[in-house]
């Protein structure tokens, strides 16, 4: 018996990778990474009905995601299996997609993390249980469960929050319109003669962290450029903007970003890019500190 239906609306924030190093490969064949994640004020919105007559997941503003095989549906399935008998109820979710898909911004992982947080609390699942579900759904989901600046290593299972991190606040995002670059395609094409050296623990002080970020890189950039040559042009255009502190690709691409200390400089850059490159998606946002 479903009983009273509860309705919720929650936001799922996108992430950017301030750096991403490939430091090895596991015995299971997966690449071992080190990265600093920061979350930004670009959100998918999830409308959730718990105890609904309906069940399932619907996506709005993007039609290319399967209703039956997606990160939200997988997260719900894992949560149901961890519930005490009789606790789980029908769940209906409508996801309004504002985060570009297959773009290196972890939109699908963010959506899964949002539903894990909400249903986990409603259904009495422990923090450890929610973390276990997150790791089962995808490598970016554990850090998205926190949605705060963090150092992530391994295959996404090791998350160290960086509460004292203070980063340039303003962000300009750019990606080629209608280009979808899957994580799998980039890693399948990735080949290196030598892995990056592990950095160990990142500095917690904000000055040290920014210095580390500036000296680091995204090891997947060259591979992404082979698949989407436009990425190289985007990075050069971002770096040329007045006030740009850093330009870099996020995740496996194809979205790139620039960081600014000055909001007016970021806005000027957005106006310039939109006027010069109508073929690009350009978005101005901020880091969630």
Swiss-Prot record:
Cysteine disulfide links: none
Catalytic activity: 4-CDP-2-C-methyl-D-erythritol + ATP = 4-CDP-2-C-methyl-D-erythritol 2-phosphate + ADP + H(+)
One GO-annotated biological process of the protein: terpenoid biosynthetic process
Broad EC category: transferase
Active site: 15, 140
Keywords tagged on the record: ATP-binding, Isoprene biosynthesis, Kinase, Nucleotide-binding, Transferase
Gene3D superfamilies linked: 3.30.230.10, GHMP kinase, C-terminal domain
UniProt xrefs under SUPFAM superfamilies: GHMP Kinase, C-terminal domain, Ribosomal protein S5 domain 2-like
Domain of life: Bacteria
Binding site for ATP: 100-110
Keyword Kinase listed: yes
Pathway: Isoprenoid biosynthesis; isopentenyl diphosphate biosynthesis via DXP pathway; isopentenyl diphosphate from 1-deoxy-D-xylulose 5-phosphate: step 3/6
Assigned EC number: 2.7.1.148
GO molecular function: 4-(cytidine 5'-diphospho)-2-C-methyl-D-erythritol kinase activity; ATP binding
Function, in words: Catalyzes the phosphorylation of the position 2 hydroxy group of 4-diphosphocytidyl-2C-methyl-D-erythritol.
Similarity-based family: Belongs to the GHMP kinase family. IspE subfamily.
Full protein name: 4-diphosphocytidyl-2-C-methyl-D-erythritol kinase
Species this chain originates from: Anaplasma marginale (strain Florida)
Gene (UniProt): ispE
